[in-house]
From Swiss-Prot:
Subunit text: Component of the biogenesis of lysosome-related organelles complex-1 (BLOC-1) composed of at least BLI1, BLS1, CNL1, KXD1, SNN1 and VAB2.
Bias (Basic and acidic residues): 299-308
Any one annotated GO CC term: vacuole
Compartments it resides in: Cytoplasmic vesicle; Vacuole; Cytoplasm
Location, primary (coarse class): cytoplasm
Region (Disordered): 299-318
Compositionally biased spans, kind Polar residues: 309-318
Organism: Vanderwaltozyma polyspora (strain ATCC 22028 / DSM 70294 / BCRC 21397 / CBS 2163 / NBRC 10782 / NRRL Y-8283 / UCD 57-17) (Kluyveromyces polysporus)
Protein name: Biogenesis of lysosome-related organelles complex 1 subunit VAB2
Coiled-coil region: 57-133
Keywords: Coiled coil, Cytoplasm, Cytoplasmic vesicle, Transport, Vacuole
Entry function: Component of the biogenesis of lysosome-related organelles complex-1 (BLOC-1) involved in endosomal cargo sorting.
Family, per entry: Belongs to the VAB2 family.
Amino acid sequence: MRNKLNFQNIEHSYAFKELSKLPSIVSSKQLRTNSIFEAVKPELKNVQNDIQMFYSVIEREINSEISQIDLVETELKKSLKNVNKSYAKIMKRRTILSSNGKNKNLAIVDDFNKEVDGLESLITGLKETVHDMIDDLVTADSQLKSNNKSVTKEEINSQHYPLLFEILQKDYNHIFKESNNLSVQDADRKSIELDIEDRTEVKSSDDKDSMNKNINIMPIEDNSITHLSFEGEPIYTKVSHENSNQVTDKGINQLDENTLNQEIKNDNLICQRSLPPKNLSNENVVNDNYADSNCLKEEKKNEVDTSKSKMGTINSTPSSTTMGNGFILPNLTKVVKPTISTTFETVVNREF
């Protein structure tokens, strides 16, 4: 008896499935060279276009770099030409200066140094001149009296002459110490006082009061008067402003009727002060604010010769007392208490 064989189909096998996935074999015509080139021709064309584009860009950049290099080279050539030209000029100038043996720049520096030396010598000369002038000023000021000195530490002097006192305080500080010592010695020398008290009775049609005068005279040596002061309380006689101006250098000239009728019983001093103020001497006047003053005795005719006075000061101080008949101050208010301080240096006659 025969055995039956069982045949197994591969259609459902794994190998058959994998084989069926493979593409079918192309024909032999497609595997030829021409067919292959025809298939890749588009891609080859794209590659060619890309290569041409890259080449054009690179070529353009290279040309730009070349043009810039050419421009830089041209500028460098010009600069080199200028450098060579300048170098040639410098060498030529150096040769000329070396041959002449003189450097103009050094000559200019030497001239400048000479000018500076001249200015320094001029400044030194000016300083010496200023110091000589100050020495002369200090010498002249030292010969004056202490109350007439200008080179002192008073603030008003330094305000008028700030530069002068700055130099004095810097280089001549010892002068202020010497001036202070001299003023103390001068005050001690003038300590002698002579007190003369005199009483004057003045009769008037309107007033019957008496006037007391205290006359203090301070004589010193060398025939000079240093201080003359009058303090009094005159009787109350009104004098008009018009008539008060009519006082001359010889005494009372024209006043009102009450004043013209008065009698001076005692031979006391009658002092006038006329305005505007005048200098006692037109040549040797130190203080500007002093006025012409004559002190006379009516009967004895003893007078101070003001024409011989060299310098002096008169100060009048108003108060709240009216003027009297025995003492007239023109151009002042009628409500005053006359106080006169007179300073002379040299007076020919000082007998009272």
